[in-house]
Amino acid sequence: MIDENKKKNTNLNKNEYEEKSILKDLFHFFGKDFCVVQDTCIDFPVIWINKSLLLKVGKFLSSSPKPYNMLFDLHGVDERFRLNRLNLPEADFSIFYHLISIERNSDILIKVPLLKDDLNVSTFISLFPNANWYERETWEMFGIIFDQHPNLTHIIMPNEWKGFPLRKDYPARATEHESFFLDEQKEDLEMENLRFKPELWGMKRKNDNVDFMFLNLGPNHPSAHGAFRIVLQLDGENIVDCVPDIGYHHRGAEKMAERQSWHSYIPYTDRIEYLGGCVNEMPYVLAVEKLANISVPEKVEVIRVMLSELFRINSHLLYISTFIQDVGCMTPVFLAFTDRQKIYDLIEAITGARMHPAWFRIGGVAHDLPKGWNVLLKEFLEWMPKRLKYYVQLALENPILIRRSKGIAQYNQKEALQWGVTGSGLRSTGLDLDVRKWRPYSGYQNYTFEIPIGQGISDCYSRVIIKVEEIYQSLSILKQCLKNMPEGPFKSDHPLTTPPPKERVLKDIDTMITHFLQVSWGPVIPANESFQMIEATKGINSYYLISDGGTMSYRTRIRTPSFPHLQQIPSVIRGSLISDLIVYLGSIDFVMSDVDR
């Protein structure tokens, strides 16, 4: 049940933040003047350093006691049109490196300023191998060159793409581009660009004894779980190497955020991981609320948790059943869709929509809970535990499934952290990293629940079993929401709550004007930066927002868990069979919209 004594503010004040952070060690080693410390709404240090110090600082952090051993994110910002840059280093562009120390439960954001005439910086791959894909995406989106990168080529965009889409002077709308024509010559060029050339990836076509076969799995193979291609280098049935090919589902979600108001971007968040629903909205609205300095009522926190856990169960059921189907059993898929229908009925009764409610708001939720919501939730809580046993008895205890998945595609905790793995893949290595416990948000510190973990090695079977246990924990959280739903408003009484409470709009002319402006132009959010991570359905999802004091975001960075999970595939599956790859893909739990954004 919700424990009032557990409620606490998890943020540090500025003095505690500086004393307890890594800054003290960095200043001692590099000197007081090696960086500029930026004051933001972010709960951990944000520093600017010269690019000549990047690898030295990275090595210091990754090798220090209680090291910063995960590169969580890496991307760029076009600084040229940013108005509010007081006390920041001169920069036309910047790159940021987000590092996490597991032992410290602490982060640091390192920024490197770059001038337009010198957009070169050293690659970070020697310290963190998962920097590879992040650097490729940053290059193609901003034109920043990473020296000594092994393969600085397009990853999201097509090979023939011209221009750098996330630069501020690149058109954001299709109507701002020239008319598109696909003549025969251009069609031939695009088809040729899809041809896989092993030499470009450091692969040999043959060795002394055998000619390798190169096989396309996808981009429309049913076991690829979306528009996803993997090119396999094969010696018979054995995978010598492989190259994941992503980007087929890219829709420019981060670019769209620069053309939508803070309020009108909420529906777009649902489509990032299209099975997650309200879970996707959570980090975005929390990050905006930090910028606006909005505290929401306790009832809002509980409602948000309740909807998030419903969507978590819904996503996990689809994952578990499709994994079982990939191994060869059909029945659980039909069970899952029956169970998921009950969840959708409950979600629809509360929000008015099913998969993509766009229901969270800046400062609250769209409307209050309807009459009878508790009856529907109670019925579901009585139904689901009994049904969950069928999945285990029908399939997960089946000796054939166990032999097909235990010990397959396995990796340890160190490897998981190197590749930026989060979610059940990391927890099955024995590390209980769940943001709901480690860095509680939306009142998660007030709930009693456990974090299921594995025995030290993550394999296909352990990953799916962790998800089953997580459903039981989500059911426990939902019971606490049902039992302890507070009374009170469903929106914060704050000038930047969008839209304002309806009852005030109808009585107060000032509030009506505010409503009109916030819905049409959007709320004006103070200039600052904020960051929010959450435990999403597939791992850690986060939003890093930069406000320049306007009605729209200056920069919205969306870090999704599926992106690094697919990058890890070659390191895990080399030397295995094609049939093992199919099981491995089913065990990752990804959708391509989450990868490509």
Swiss-Prot record:
InterPro entries: NADH_DH_suC (IPR010218), NADH_DH_suCD (IPR023062), NADH_Q_OxRdtase_suD (IPR001135), NADH_quin_OxRdtase_su_C/D-like (IPR037232), NADH_UbQ_OxRdtase_30kDa_su (IPR001268), NADH_UbQ_OxRdtase_49kDa_CS (IPR014029), NDH1_su_D/H (IPR022885), NiFe-Hase_large (IPR029014). It catalyses: a quinone + NADH + 5 H(+)(in) = a quinol + NAD(+) + 4 H(+)(out). One of its GO terms (cellular component) is NADH dehydrogenase complex. GO terms for molecular function: NAD binding; NADH dehydrogenase (ubiquinone) activity; NADH:ubiquinone reductase (non-electrogenic) activity; quinone binding. NCBIfam families: NuoC_fam, NuoD, PRK06075.1, PRK11742.1. It is an enzyme of class 7 (translocase). This is NADH-quinone oxidoreductase subunit C/D. NDH-1 shuttles electrons from NADH, via FMN and iron-sulfur (Fe-S) centers, to quinones in the respiratory chain. The immediate electron acceptor for the enzyme in this species is believed to be ubiquinone. Couples the redox reaction to proton translocation (for every two electrons transferred, four hydrogen ions are translocated across the cytoplasmic membrane), and thus conserves the redox energy in a proton gradient. SUPFAM superfamilies: HydB/Nqo4-like, Nqo5-like. It comes from Buchnera aphidicola subsp. Schizaphis graminum (strain Sg). Gene3D superfamilies: Cytochrome-c3 Hydrogenase, chain B, NADH:ubiquinone oxidoreductase, 30kDa subunit. Its main location: membrane. Its EC number is 7.1.1.-.
